[in-house]
Amino acid sequence: MSSVQSQQEQLSQSDPSPSPNSCSSFELIDMDAGSLYEPVSPHWFYCKIIDSKETWIPFNSEDSQQLEEAYSSGKGCNGRVVPTDGGRYDVHLGERMRYAVYWDELASEVRRCTWFYKGDKDNKYVPYSESFSQVLEETYMLAVTLDEWKKKLESPNREIIILHNPKLMVHYQPVAGSDDWGSTPTEQGRPRTVKRGVENISVDIHCGEPLQIDHLVFVVHGIGPACDLRFRSIVQCVNDFRSVSLNLLQTHFKKAQENQQIGRVEFLPVNWHSPLHSTGVDVDLQRITLPSINRLRHFTNDTILDVFFYNSPTYCQTIVDTVASEMNRIYTLFLQRNPDFKGGVSIAGHSLGSLILFDILTNQKDSLGDIDSEKDSLNIVMDQGDTPTLEEDLKKLQLSEFFDIFEKEKVDKEALALCTDRDLQEIGIPLGPRKKILNYFSTRKNSMGIKRPAPQPASGANIPKESEFCSSSNTRNGDYLDVGIGQVSVKYPRLIYKPEIFFAFGSPIGMFLTVRGLKRIDPNYRFPTCKGFFNIYHPFDPVAYRIEPMVVPGVEFEPMLIPHHKGRKRMHLELREGLTRMSMDLKNNLLGSLRMAWKSFTRAPYPALQASETPEETEAEPESTSEKPSDVNTEETSVAVKEEVLPINVGMLNGGQRIDYVLQEKPIESFNEYLFALQSHLCYWESEDTVLLVLKEIYQTQGIFLDQPLQ
């Protein structure tokens, strides 16, 4: 402020007796110079610690405008709270601090920025403090008004700023050990560039997010605190997922946006790793961890052991409680902050997070709250009391005449299931009926479905009841239910909403179900409260497993290929398929030619008289022979086309739709699938194809479709 005051004193101490023309000329100069000055437009920034460095990030244009309006109003500014970033953060204007709403995060400083200087090690500009920016602005105003430059200012940190002209302003750092009579600024190293106004620095400022929220998606992470190769948290990865979705809405749902049919989809992260490792288990593990290869052991304890924690009854209870309670808490808070929200809710899980959600969904109840009254809506395997009798089974097989024989021998269904072909022969059952009966009971025995949870006894102690079609070989006595897919016995919390769709990214659900002893998922099974289920994975993902072969074990078919977000297949995949088709065509044509040549070589010669009498037949025969391979190929092609067109029944787990969806690998990934295996498991957060599939399925439930269907 001393330089500003001295400048004002110079103005007041000017010559009191100017020439007659000097006053008017000064006024003219002042008017011309004053017209060049325009107040700077402020923009609001917040500070984030990234890689142990402070990074200043601009608010989007809408949020910055709201903050500026609240600041300019001056009414209760100290206690004013402004929601930003789509309502996920609150800015306390008086404190100049930004707080996360739905998750735990360190508060970040907020600043109203007008002047910037370039940082030391990168090209990013750093804003000056608000107070010093005001000093710079006042000095700049006087310099422009009086057209007097070379202004020198000293910051609170004894740093020197010199305003040479409107386009050249520099910042010098102080030299250690120098005093007021020390070296001049030009001797203090390389100067930094100073800029006025956010429009003069290179920074990306987004327009903002639509206010309307159409759908809410909770995203649950997998093992460890980091979710990608950059060791970012679930919050940062979901931020990327959300940003990709906003871009895709503008490019693939443009018509719906122009007609104001849609707003956006909100993705909120759910963190269970921190509560799990805050129980003190890390201290217990540290005591028994060997001192060698310390970093590797620490990584193992912090990530891979989460899989073992989930298979432990004690820590599994902590995990499912945390996930369910967090989703319920966030959902309640979301409704409080968005009272006009009328959209649906979906859930998504990555890696182990998808298995956690699968187990929670399997153990949900419908709105009636009575598991035993859900038979018609769930369509899952019934208990033993509802299974058909032996007489009904024989009637179904059209073998009712043999019921008297079984009744005479006191053979019920359980005994018949243990009978061999020889046993049935000894009691007088003919060969044909024996084969029918054995095949029927063998099929029933191998048809392993997910079992319904047993009803709770009146005493409150829940003892699971084994069903005839129970998939697990071991019976567990636990606090709550055993649904027959091998989970540890824990009490699964109830969600306060019904998810519409469950998305699994890079999911090991299929592997875990198989290891638990489940051989087959009943085609009629569906989640009690969730209608849709999509298993999305990268072809090189080492953690991902398919689900559809467990529903239809006897049929081999490929998963659904997720279209590229720009349409069609990737070029290298089309080239590969084209070369495969061409090689098959060449192979078929070559085999056909060799077959014709061999037949011509081995065929007996016709008599000359016969050849002369029937030349047309002689010419027609090789033609018909040459047509046979093409006919065969045509038939094979038509059969293949029919097989592709025919729908595949994959059960009701996804409402009759396909379950497994595979991404297209990138061209560079196809060179070495082992090299990109780990990256493939962590690619979903920034995958446009994955995000577009999620958006497409969500908006289809609302009757809104892509501008152009992808092929």
From Swiss-Prot:
Its EC number is 3.1.1.3, 3.1.1.-. Residues 495-700 form the DDHD domain. One of its GO terms (cellular component) is COPII-coated ER to Golgi transport vesicle. It is an enzyme of class 3 (hydrolase). It is found in: Cytoplasm, Cytosol; Endoplasmic reticulum-Golgi intermediate compartment; Golgi apparatus, cis-Golgi network. InterPro entries: DDHD_dom (IPR004177), SAM (IPR001660), SAM/pointed_sf (IPR013761), WWE_dom (IPR004170). The active site is at 351 (nucleophile). It catalyses: a triacylglycerol + H2O = a diacylglycerol + a fatty acid + H(+); a diacylglycerol + H2O = a monoacylglycerol + a fatty acid + H(+); a 1,3-diacylglycerol + H2O = a 1-acylglycerol + a fatty acid + H(+); a 1-acylglycerol + H2O = glycerol + a fatty acid + H(+). Residues 385-448 form the SAM domain. Widely expressed (at protein level). Changing residue 434 to A: Loss of phospholipid binding and of Golgi/ERGIC localization. Diacylglycerol (DAG) and triacylglycerol (TAG) lipase required for proper lipid homeostasis in the central nervous system. It cooperates with PNPLA2/ATGL in neuronal TAG catabolism and hydrolyzes sn-1,3 DAG downstream of PNPLA2/ATGL. In vitro, it also acts as a phospholipase that hydrolyzes preferentially phosphatidic acids, including 1,2-dioleoyl-sn-phosphatidic acid, phosphatidylcholine and phosphatidylethanolamine. Forms homooligomers and, to a much smaller extent, heterooligomers with DDHD1. This is Triacylglycerol hydrolase DDHD2. It comes from Homo sapiens. The lineage of its organism: Eukaryota, Metazoa, Chordata, Craniata, Vertebrata. The gene is DDHD2.
